[in-house]
């Protein structure tokens, strides 16, 4: 998959064609790392590199076929586990979320799949992002998992709430307060960027750039880098985000280390726009 992925990133192959290649061939991939990379790339292709006009259709297809791959995989295999995790990351249609809910409730089972604490959080976060669960379910899950990992997973799930209020609370918890460790900042960013309706992130284009210099000057490098990388509203991946990023770079010649981080984020958006243009053909 690697060479085809490079061509997809370069805007030479349509994202939907890369997705089809992976879905048609990934079942026979027997090397765990290669499988993990292929599934991560499949997710990026469907969520970011696809043309917006047919993105929802592609995502629905990807999720449905990942569920089928999960059901068909050898019970207890690494493939089965990775297919299920990726399915949970992209599930958005009602029928797909029904499977997630049933697995979490125990009303549906897959031979070989054990719902441990980590997988339980991933399934719950999928339901939260899909509007099927909320703060009560997150609080209950955290009460049952009083570990550092549980706290991180709860922060990610809360930040994935698909409402303007949820995104604002996630933003405020780490940008306006300076009390959380790097691990919580990082997982909050993961949940914040998870948005089936990417327009939830639109208000943060301006807020992000307004706050950059301040967090760079006031936080440790590790925290600042986690904020800058984790809360850049990259799921928007459109001309408005690109132009705002270019404008900030034009207006801020210093400091070089901060500019370097932002320039790398700009490169990602520009790459996504090229890929989207190709996928629209």
Regions found by a protein language model. Give the residues of each.
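Long, ordered, helix-rich scaffold segments
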Residues: 1-281
């Amino acid at each position: 998959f690697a060479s085809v992925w490079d061509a997809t990133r370069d805007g030479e192959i349509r994202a939907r064609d890369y997705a089809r290649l992976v879905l048609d061939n990934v079942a026979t991939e027997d090397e765990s790392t290669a499988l993990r990379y292929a599934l991560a790339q499949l997710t990026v292709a469907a969520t970011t590199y696809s043309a917006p006009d047919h993105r929802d259709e592609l995502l629905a297809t990807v999720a449905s076929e990942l569920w089928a791959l999960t059901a068909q995989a050898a019970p207890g295999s690494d493939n089965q586990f990775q297919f299920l995790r990726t399915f949970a990351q992209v599930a958005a249609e009602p029928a797909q979320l029904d499977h997630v809910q049933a697995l979490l409730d125990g009303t549906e089972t897959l031979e070989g799949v054990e719902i441990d604490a980590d997988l339980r959080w991933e399934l719950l976060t999928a339901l939260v992002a899909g509007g099927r669960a909320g703060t009560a379910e997150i609080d209950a899950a955290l009460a049952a998992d009083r570990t550092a990992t549980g706290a991180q997973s709860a922060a990610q799930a809360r930040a994935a709430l698909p409402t303007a209020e949820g995104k604002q609370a996630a933003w405020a918890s780490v940008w306006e307060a300076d009390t959380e460790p790097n691990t919580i900042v990082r997982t909050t960013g993961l949940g914040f960027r998870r948005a089936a309706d990417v327009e939830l992130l639109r208000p943060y284009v301006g807020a992000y750039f307004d706050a950059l210099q301040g967090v760079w000057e006031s936080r440790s490098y590790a925290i600042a880098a986690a904020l800058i990388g984790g809360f850049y509203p990259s799921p928007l991946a459109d001309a408005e985000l690109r132009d705002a990023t270019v404008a900030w770079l034009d207006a801020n010649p210093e400091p070089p280390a901060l500019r370097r981080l932002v320039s790398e984020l700009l490169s990602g958006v520009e790459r996504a726009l090229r890929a989207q243009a190709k996928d629209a053909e």
